[in-house]
């Protein structure tokens, strides 16, 4: 028998990286929020690699922080190492990556959730949704508890009908041998959702005390203090290194010999795996010309001897995994503490979602994270904060928030999912963003803090600091535009020292900074400011002046795109009534139901001729409505 267990504005199912951001965002915006999770000990658990950030992903963490989310602050408090990647490349592809103390990461985030007003965290497995007349009204748990809500967010990760696979061993399980969620998956199918089967995997963990580090290469963190959050002022300087080793020809021979025992190659696994995180079996087969592959040894925390063997994700049986580890330099005598495994799980086809992450089929129901077909903690958290924001907005009667492709990587991620769908676990890459020069690591706050403040996630004190920073950047840029640096001996000497051409005449400080060999630090020496300019402001001034021409070109492209985005498509449009559209385009348009002509133009199978016909039809419809009035 069921019983009434309470009423909420927002209910979040799951407390992984998507669920944590969704629950915190909704509660901080003033919605009475309930987070339900199968196991309270697994809040913010990292079932795979103990790290946050990296190319594109690190920028997402900055964006979450700029909106008022928690991931950046939490990793800043709990990392064991931090590095800026791609420092030799342009600012568009630079990204921060941190190694996490995964246990401390969990502990700190759970503590934050427990201490957040308006937020209740409870253990319980949701088996069904309460749906009336196509509207989600709440959830029912395994124990019969019925919780009603104005909105519900599903963030179930890889738990939906999860199955762990190692060799010919296969059993029903969530990640790390947790209880899977089977009934909810079946219920979503009953409600008419189209589900797909995806697969991911994880490598073995080994005991640090049994590694011969003398045969590996040290990978230290950066000496310069770094942080993901724009709020962080205390930095962890006591860092722990990672270590680099490689597979050997013996490793590859062993894998080839046992390929028939890999679940990936025996036919045991039916789900599609992630393209950009292949198993070691895949790497050996697909890149058989490579004599070795990189293996990174990543400590899982400060108070554990467990080491994550990055690059060795596998579904080979346990006995082969043990042998395989011993063929790697430094791991000849290693003790395996946990086996690697593959996991298959259900995901929904994401074209069934609106750009707000609300499902098209059921009103007031949102989904975020791996259930939407993505891979990665950061992608999940980015969707989680947006689903939480929009679920809260709906519950509070406010306008929902949609980030565009020129606003954030989160916008690129969600637009790709809901417009194009995905036939494999989706990973965010810098190459997916056409405006990546605008979507940089360094300017996430300038892009998104105002949105976070407007919806109530950025407090006044933080917004005031942001406004001062923005003003300082503009003032310093204007100062450098107005200062003339003359060819004095000390100026010529500095320019010569960095390999530049000497000045013939006076030059504006901003123009001198545009030279590739010059930095803001050089300009500061030649034309010091009376005000103290901090590093964040200096970085912005340098990037905005140096890349001004390229940024201007990107902004012009954005303006053209926004014209297409501003041409809205009526939600109730009848695509069958539009003659001349190709049948594939008609089918895709009916499936995705784009909200704008811009979104329609990004659907695969919809070509420019179809867009032209659609534009004419919409314009004619507007004319007809006006003439009827």
UniProtKB/Swiss-Prot annotation:
Cofactor(s), names only, from the UniProt record: FAD
InterPro entries linked: FAD/NAD-bd_sf, GIDA_C_N, MnmG, MnmG-rel, MnmG-rel_CS, MnmG_C, MnmG_C_subdom, MnmG_C_subdom_sf
One of the record's GO molecular function terms: flavin adenine dinucleotide binding
Chain positions recorded as NAD(+) binding sites: 273-287
Residues engaged in binding FAD: 14-19, 126, 181, 370
The organism's place on the tree of life at top rank: Bacteria
Subcellular location: Cytoplasm
GO terms, biological process: tRNA methylation; tRNA wobble uridine modification
Assigned GO CC terms: cytosol
Entry keywords, A to Z: Cytoplasm, FAD, Flavoprotein, NAD, tRNA processing
Residues of the signal peptide: none
Pfam families per record: GIDA, GIDA_C_1st, SAM_GIDA_C
PANTHER family cross-referenced by the UniProt entry: GLUCOSE INHIBITED DIVISION PROTEIN A, PROTEIN MTO1 HOMOLOG, MITOCHONDRIAL
Subunit structure: Homodimer. Heterotetramer of two MnmE and two MnmG subunits.
Protein purpose: NAD-binding protein involved in the addition of a carboxymethylaminomethyl (cmnm) group at the wobble position (U34) of certain tRNAs, forming tRNA-cmnm(5)s(2)U34.
Family: Belongs to the MnmG family.
Name the UniProt record assigns to this protein: tRNA uridine 5-carboxymethylaminomethyl modification enzyme MnmG
Organism, as annotated: Bacillus cytotoxicus (strain DSM 22905 / CIP 110041 / 391-98 / NVH 391-98)
């Amino acid at each position: 028998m069921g019983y009434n267990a309470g009423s909420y504005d927002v209910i979040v199912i799951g407390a992984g990286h998507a669920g944590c951001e969704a629950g915190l965002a909704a509660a901080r915006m003033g919605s009475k929020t309930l987070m339900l999770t199968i196991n309270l000990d697994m809040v913010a658990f990292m079932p795979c690699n103990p790290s946050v950030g990296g190319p594109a992903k690190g920028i997402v963490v900055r964006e979450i922080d700029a909106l008022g989310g928690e991931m950046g602050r939490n990793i800043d408090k709990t990392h064991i190492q931090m590095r800026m990647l791609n420092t030799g490349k342009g600012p568009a592809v630079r990204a921060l990556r941190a190694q996490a103390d995964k246990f401390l990461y969990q502990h700190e985030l759970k503590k934050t959730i427990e201490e957040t007003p308006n937020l209740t965290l409870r253990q319980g497995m949701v088996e069904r949704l309460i749906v009336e007349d196509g509207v989600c009204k709440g959830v029912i748990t395994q124990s019969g508890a019925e919780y009603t809500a104005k909105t519900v967010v599903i963030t179930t990760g890889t738990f939906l009908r999860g199955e762990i696979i190692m060799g010919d061993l296969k059993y029903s399980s969530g990640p790390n041998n947790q209880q899977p969620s089977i009934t909810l998956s079946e219920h979503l199918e009953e409600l008419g959702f189209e589900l797909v089967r995806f697969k991911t995997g994880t490598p073995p963990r080994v005991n640090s005390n049994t590694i011969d580090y003398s045969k590996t290469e040290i990978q230290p963190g950066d000496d310069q203090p770094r942080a993901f959050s724009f709020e962080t002022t205390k930095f962890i300087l006591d860092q722990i290194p990672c270590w680099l080793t490689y597979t050997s020809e013996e490793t590859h021979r062993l894998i080839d010999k046992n390929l028939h025992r890999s679940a990936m190659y025996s036919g045991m696994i039916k789900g599609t795996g992630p393209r950009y995180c292949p198993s070691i079996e895949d790497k050996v087969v697909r890149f058989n010309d490579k004599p070795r592959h990189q293996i990174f040894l990543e400590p899982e925390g400060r108070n554990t001897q467990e080491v994550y063997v990055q690059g060795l994700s596998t579904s080979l049986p346990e006995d082969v995994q043990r042998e395989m580890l011993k063929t790697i330099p430094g791991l000849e005598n290693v003790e395996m503490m946990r086996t690697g495994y593959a996991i298959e799980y259900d995901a929904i086809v994401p074209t069934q979602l609106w750009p707000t992450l609300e499902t098209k089929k059921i009103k007031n129901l949102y989904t975020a994270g791996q259930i939407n077909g993505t891979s990665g903690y950061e992608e999940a958290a980015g969707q989680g904060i947006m689903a939480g924001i929009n679920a809260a907005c709906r519950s509070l009667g406010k306008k929902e928030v949609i980030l565009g492709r020129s606003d954030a990587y989160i916008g690129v991620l969600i637009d790709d999912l809901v417009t194009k769908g995905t036939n494999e676990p989706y990973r965010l890459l810098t190459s997916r963003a056409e405006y990546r020069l605008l979507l940089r690591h360094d300017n996430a706050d300038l892009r998104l803090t105002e949105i976070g403040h407007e919806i109530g996630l950025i407090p006044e004190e933080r917004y005031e600091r942001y406004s001062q920073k923005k003003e300082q950047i503009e003032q310093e840029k204007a100062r450098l535009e107005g200062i003339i640096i003359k060819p004095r001996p000390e100026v010529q000497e500095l320019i010569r020292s960095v390999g530049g051409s000497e000045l013939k005449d006076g030059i504006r400080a901003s123009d001198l900074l545009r030279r590739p060999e010059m930095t803001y630090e050089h300009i500061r020496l030649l034309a010091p400011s009376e005000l103290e300019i901090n590093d964040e402001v200096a970085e912005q001034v340098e990037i905005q002046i140096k890349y001004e021409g390229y940024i201007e070109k990107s902004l012009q492209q954005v303006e053209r795109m926004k014209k297409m985005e501003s041409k809205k498509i009526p939600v109730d449009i009848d695509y069958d009534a539009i003659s001349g559209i190709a049948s594939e385009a008609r089918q895709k348009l009916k499936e995705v139901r784009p909200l704008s002509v811009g979104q329609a133009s990004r659907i695969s199978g919809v070509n420019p001729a179809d867009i032209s016909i659609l534009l004419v039809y919409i314009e004619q419809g507007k004319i007809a409505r006006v003439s009827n009035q």
